[in-house]
Structure formats: structure tokens, C-alpha cells
Regions:
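Short Gly/Pro-enriched turn/cap motifs at secondary-structure boundaries
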Residues: 48, 73-74, 107-113, 175-180, ...
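Cysteine-cluster motifs in flexible loop/terminal segments that predominantly coordinate metals
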Residues: 140-193
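N-terminal secretory signal peptides
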Residues: 1-11, 15
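Cytochrome P450 core scaffold surrounding the K-helix E-X-X-R motif
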Residues: 94-96
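Mid-domain Rossmann-like dinucleotide-binding core that forms the NAD(H)/NADP(H) cofactor-binding site
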Residues: 199-259
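Glycine-rich beta-strand-centered segment in the early N-terminal region that forms part
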Residues: 75-89, 102-152, 157, 197-201
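N-terminal export leaders
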Residues: 12-29
Length: 259
């Protein structure tokens, strides 16, 4: 795939995973080692029959950040929602900060995790882009108004109506626990707009880190229209930095590593 083809394909973050699956030097070849199955769901045969979703998880109960097993209920699947049986959830350093209250007072118990992949096991009546059995991923957001100017322009994190819901720790009166709960769990309910399809030729455990770390380093390349011959500085070659270096666009760019 040449540079022009890549640039034409990368018109939105929703094409990101598809590109990573088709370009030989794609980011999934990083084989990131910080994913692990959180709940052994592979043998489960889940059938949603309506009502709240019983969920098993690992949660923080105080600012120690220690995670312990916890069972709770999620809100019912709405008309525009999908229910995902989670297979893998990556560990992001921001999970640790939030669970320890480093960014302000937290509501506990709280289930972290915002790099989530799994299998769709139920869909709302208005959902057309997913069906039961599809492979799906979820990042750091699960809902917004989708009607304001920011949402319509793909900036749901800046929802003008202040209805952005992040994947965990956000107040949500629809949830039995009063807040959103994340991906270190067996299941998650998410508005279909905030889920992406995971291509069949990406291993689920390798796709998970792309839902935050991968997209975080991908987005600025697109926002600033990085082109062949441009110089890009990568500050630190850690969890995000090494994924930045493996972005397919980087084969056309001079890379400056800042340690």
C-alpha cells in the first residue's frame, strides 16, 4: 500500500484498526505485552434476556487502588446500545492514576479499563452496524449527545451539551452503581456509535491497546496532516511511543526520538 492510498484511507479514527490490519508494518505487529484476559469468558455462553446486566469484575474500593473481585449490575441494553462480552482489556497507566484518586475524589467501587475488546452478545432494536457475534472494541468514551456541533464533527469528548460519558468513573443515573464502570469486567453496555469493529485478521489481545494508546498517537498525525518528508518528534519510547513508531504513516516520515 503506497502513501497516497494510506492517506486516502485514514479519513477518520474509525478506519484506524482496518489499516493496521492491512499494512504489513502495522501497529499490531508490536505484539504489546500488557494485555491479559481479565475475566475467563471464553467458555461462557451468554444469552441476554433483558433487564440489568449481571457482571463480574475487578474493582478498586478505595484510594489504595488495589483491585478485588466484585459483582455488580450494569444498565439494561437500550435501543441504540450493544452488549459486549469482554475478552481482553489492556492496562493503561491512567487507570492506575484514576483508581488511586490522583486526579481528584473518586466514587468507589470503581472498575477501570478503557481499552476493551470482545464479542457482541446483544444489540438494541435501532442498531444496524453490529450484530450478535461481531468482534468489537471500545475506547475511553461510551456515550454523548451526538447532536451538538462538536459531536457531529467527531469531537464527542468536547460535547457542547456536556453529555460526554467516559468509560468509567463518570456519573450516570442510568447505571445501578451511579457511575460508568470500565473494562476489567465480563461485560459492558455501550452506545453503538462508540464501538468499532475489530477485523478478523487482528488478534483480539493485540487490538486492545490500539483503542487508546494506538489512537492517541495516531490522532495527531491526522490532525496536523503529517506528510511525506515531515519530521515528527516522539517523546519517550514507552507504551504510547513505541506504538507511534509502528504507525504505518511513519514509514514515510523522518522520526526524531526524544528520550
Amino acid at each position: 500500500m503506497d502513501k497516497d492510498s494510506i492517506m486516502n484511507t485514514l479519513i477518520s479514527r474509525r478506519n484506524f484498526l482496518k489499516l493496521s490490519a492491512t499494512v504489513g508494518v502495522g501497529m499490531v505487529s508490536a505484539r504489546t505485552a500488557h494485555t491479559a484476559p481479565i475475566i475467563p469468558t471464553a467458555q461462557m455462553k451468554y444469552h441476554y434476556t433483558g433487564g440489568n446486566v449481571k457482571t463480574k469484575a475487578y474493582a478498586a474500593f478505595d484510594e489504595s487502588g488495589e483491585l478485588r473481585p466484585w459483582e455488580f449490575e450494569r444498565r439494561p441494553v437500550g435501543d441504540n446500545d450493544i452488549l459486549i462480552e469482554i475478552k481482553y482489556a489492556s492496562i493503561c497507566h491512567s487507570d492506575i492514576h484514576q483508581e488511586k484518586g490522583d486526579w481528584g475524589k473518586m466514587t468507589y467501587p470503581q472498575v477501570p479499563g478503557h481499552e476493551i475488546v470482545g464479542i457482541v452478545v446483544a444489540v438494541g432494536k435501532n442498531v444496524t452496524k453490529f450484530k450478535i457475534g461481531d468482534r468489537a472494541g471500545v475506547g475511553c468514551m461510551v456515550d454523548s449527545c451526538l447532536e451538538c456541533e462538536s459531536c457531529k464533527n467527531g469531537l464527542e469528548q468536547h460535547c457542547d451539551n456536556d453529555q460526554t460519558l467516559f468509560t468509567y468513573g463518570n456519573p450516570d443515573n442510568r447505571e445501578p452503581t451511579s457511575i460508568t464502570q470500565g473494562g476489567y469486567s465480563s461485560h459492558i453496555v455501550v452506545r453503538d456509535h462508540f464501538a468499532v469493529h475489530i477485523p478478523e485478521n487482528i488478534k483480539l489481545q493485540e487490538a486492545a491497546p490500539l483503542l487508546c494508546a494506538g489512537i492517541t498517537t495516531y490522532s495527531p498525525l491526522m490532525k496536523y496532516k503529517i506528510n511525506k518528508g515531515d519530521k515528527v518528534g516522539v517523546v519517550g519510547i514507552g507504551g504510547l511511543g513505541h506504538l507511534a513508531l509502528m504507525n504505518p504513516l511513519m514509514i514515510f516520515i523522518k522520526i526524531i526520538k526524544l528520550r
